[in-house]
Structure formats: C-alpha cells, structure tokens
C-alpha cells in the first residue's frame, strides 16, 4: 500500500531475547544488516502484518513471540534517489513504518531463515539493543533511532540504557574478526 504522499506502509520488527539483546539479520543479496521489516497488505492490520513478516522472514510464529509494544505513530524515511523507481505507478519515495517490539519466548533453533524460495536473510545474531544505530544504512538511521528510543522504556524502565540523543552516528568499520557485539 502506497499512500498519496508516496510512502509505502510497512512494519519494522525488533525481536528482543531474555537478555534484552535484539535479533540483527544480514540481508541475503545485499549483505547489509537490518531488523526484519515488510509491507502491510491492504486487507491486514499492522499487527497482522508484523506477525506475517516474522513468520516469512525469520520463521517465527505467534507461539515464539509476545508483543511488548509498538510505536504510537508512523515513522517515515525517504529513499535515496538511486532507489526510487520513477517508472512505477504509484510512485514510492519512501516507507512509513509502525515498529513492533517483541519478546522472543522460543528456542534459538526456532529461528528459520529459509522458509521461502527467496529468503530475505542468510545470517542472524543477537546484538546489544543500541548496536543497530551504528550499523544501519544511513537513510534508515533516524527512523531506527526514533523507534529504539520510543520502545526502550518498555524493556529498560530505568532508562539507564538510553544513549545520548544524537542524530548523526559516525560510521564504524567492521572488524575482521567477529566478537560478541
């Protein structure tokens, strides 16, 4: 669904384990990392879309997760011009997202990335709640910051884990050896 302003309705999914670490997944074709996300169909609510996308992208059903909360309103980002398909009608210039925070209550082996013919992701790991802000592609960074900051009090009631508000996180190089992040 693309609205009259050119934004595609979408859900973003933050899956948090019992240690308050979040599922971070590597896209199969681009080798970029991100949270699972996906479009909202005309016939479904954002909550229904969130559950459907969880199952399609990481193989988790309602028995594996519990909704903790979601953002109060749509969070928008514009696509860089090189990603806009100007020949498509209606024209999509970006995404508007409702973000859901889920508690993972399943087992590690329940995460299945290969349930579709074209999997979205080829690898996943648990990372610190704030880690994605340093690693996400630049044009999604502000939306990630807003979603993580809005949802953080639901799992960090004392707010001690909130980072200082900064709109421009510096890009960091990936280390060649991977340690627990």
UniProtKB/Swiss-Prot annotation:
Top-rank EC class of the record's enzyme: hydrolase
Purpose: Accelerates the degradation of transcripts by removing pyrophosphate from the 5'-end of triphosphorylated RNA, leading to a more labile monophosphorylated state that can stimulate subsequent ribonuclease cleavage.
Cofactor: a divalent metal cation
Record family assignment: Belongs to the Nudix hydrolase family. RppH subfamily.
Recorded name of the encoding gene: rppH
Alphabetical UniProt keywords: Hydrolase
GO molecular function, one term: pyrophosphatase activity
Protein name, as recorded: RNA pyrophosphohydrolase
């Amino acid at each position: 669904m693309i609205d009259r302003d050119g934004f595609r309705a979408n859900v973003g999914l933050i899956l948090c384990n019992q240690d308050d670490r979040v599922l971070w997944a590597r896209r199969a074709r681009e080798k970029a990392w991100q949270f699972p996300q996906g479009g909202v169909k005309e016939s479904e609510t954002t909550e229904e879309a969130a559950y459907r996308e969880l199952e399609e992208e990481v193989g988790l059903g309602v028995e594996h997760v519990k909704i903790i909360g979601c953002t109060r309103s749509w969070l928008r980002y514009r696509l860089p011009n090189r990603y806009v398909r100007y020949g498509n009608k209606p024209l999509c210039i970006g995404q508007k997202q409702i973000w859901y925070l889920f508690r993972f209550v399943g087992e590690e082996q329940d995460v299945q990335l290969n349930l579709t013919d074209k999997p979205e992701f080829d690898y996943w790991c648990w990372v610190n709640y704030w880690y994605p802000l340093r690693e996400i592609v630049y044009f999604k960074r502000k939306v990630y910051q807003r979603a993580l900051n809005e949802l953080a009090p639901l799992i960090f009631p004392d707010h001690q884990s909130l980072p200082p508000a900064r709109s421009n996180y510096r890009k960091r190089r990936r280390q060649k050896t991977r340690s627990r992040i």
